[in-house]
A protein has these predicted regions:
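ATP-dependent kinase catalytic cores of phosphoinositide-metabolizing enzymes
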Residues: 1-209, 224, 229-368
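Canonical protein kinase catalytic loop motif
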Residues: 218, 223-224
Length: 368
């Protein structure tokens, strides 16, 4: 690169190096209170100048024109120091019906910045989640997945899109909302209202898809800080640092099936409700839908086999991944297996104990 191209490259990399570097500057504060971390983030954000043409690595389709310098927020992590910040992003308008309309639109976009985490694993998980989404869409199966963007910007550094208008179960607990059903009623109205029923449907459809994905990929660390609920009532799983053959602390303590707590089932209407029956039916359909694509999904994961990602334990990892599709089962046997997964997951004691451990160690609340 030479001339203006070289200058543009240097401006862009200098910009997100400074922003991402704030996460690194927080390391001495890892054991400090959130207000102390927040003050440090604000101090560092005030130093950052926005130069012309720079963009967020996870959103190259728009230019950053400003920063909300008081938006920095430290995020929950036992050993790392991720933080979230908000930027004003200017995007070109593709089609203007009126020539007097402005050629661009400004939107506020939040992103999470990490140092000390290998985001390649998140990128892999989300790439595979996008594969699952395409499979389900191709057959017209009404389930929901949100493969948001993650970009590894350097070894051990990355930028992660924030799910818009979403709240984690952890944040609900800290706001003294101790029941997931209460959250849905407070946000969408009475249980018999149209808005609540639509949110419940969105919840069920997304729970079914993520349940299958979490089982197939053996996604771990499913505490309440890693489960989000968007503005339409969908569940969205985030943070894929533990999958396949690893779990937090080197153990695989959580359920083999997936997380399905009592309060999640309560949002569906209860264990004996039509909502739960729909959930179980969608889990079976989603599981059967992805089985013919087992080789493609395994092949995508196999691209990372030669890396040093901790989730891979050699070819055996891929063999176990392929086995979870139950390739030797008939369609009926596979459907019964999916039903067994739902039965195993419901109120699984391992999931409850993991939530208890997270509450004791990291102060992440859950409903008892």
């Amino acid at each position: 690169l030479t001339g203006e191209a070289q200058a543009y490259y240097e401006r862009e990399f200098a910009f997100f190096k400074k922003v991402t570097g704030i996460s690194g500057s927080l390391r001495p504060y890892v054991k400090c209170s959130k207000p102390e971390k927040k003050a440090k983030i604000d101090e560092e954000m005030a130093k950052i100048a926005v130069e012309e043409g720079v963009y967020l690595p996870s959103n190259p389709d728009g230019a950053v024109v400003d920063i909300d310098r008081t938006s920095g927020r430290p995020l929950q992590s036992a050993a790392k120091t991720p933080f979230m910040a908000t930027f004003k992003v200017r995007r070109a308008v593709a089609e203007r019906t009126n020539p007097d309309d402005p050629p661009h639109v400004d939107v506020w976009q939040s992103a999470i910045f990490k140092v000390g985490d290998d985001c390649r694993q998140d990128m892999l998980a989300l790439q595979v989640i996008a594969q699952f989404k395409n499979i389900f869409m191709a057959i017209g199966l009404d389930v929901y997945l949100d493969p948001y963007r993650v970009t590894a910007t350097a070894p051990g550094c990355g930028v992660i899109d924030v799910v818009p208008n979403a709240t984690s179960r952890d944040e609900m607990g800290r706001a003294k909302i101790n029941d997931l059903s209460d959250f849905y009623k407070n946000r969408y109205g009475d249980e018999h209202s149209v808005a609540f029923q639509q949110a419940r449907l969105n919840f069920i459809q997304s729970m079914a898809a993520y349940s299958v994905v979490c089982h197939i990929l053996q996604i771990r660390d499913r505490h309440n800080g890693n489960i989000m609920f968007d503005g339409e009532g969908h569940v969205v799983h985030i943070d894929f640092g533990f999958l396949f053959d690893i779990g937090p602390g080197g153990m695989r303590f959580e359920p083999y099936s997936f997380k399905l707590s009592h309060e999640m089932v309560d949002v569906m209407g209860g264990h004996e409700s039509p909502g739960f029956a729909m959930f179980e039916q969608l889990v079976v359909k989603a599981y059967l839908a992805c089985r013919p694509f087992a080789h493609e999904i395994v092949a995508t994961c196999g691209l990372m086999l030669g890396t040093d990602l901790p989730s891979f334990k050699g070819k055996a990892t891929l063999d176990r991944l392929h086995e979870r599709f139950k390739p030797n089962m008939t369609e009926r046997e596979a459907a019964l297996h999916a039903q067994w997964l739902v039965k195993d997951a419901y109120g699984n004691m391992r999931g409850t104990l993991y939530d208890l451990i997270q509450e004791k160690q990291n102060h992440i609340p859950y409903r008892r």
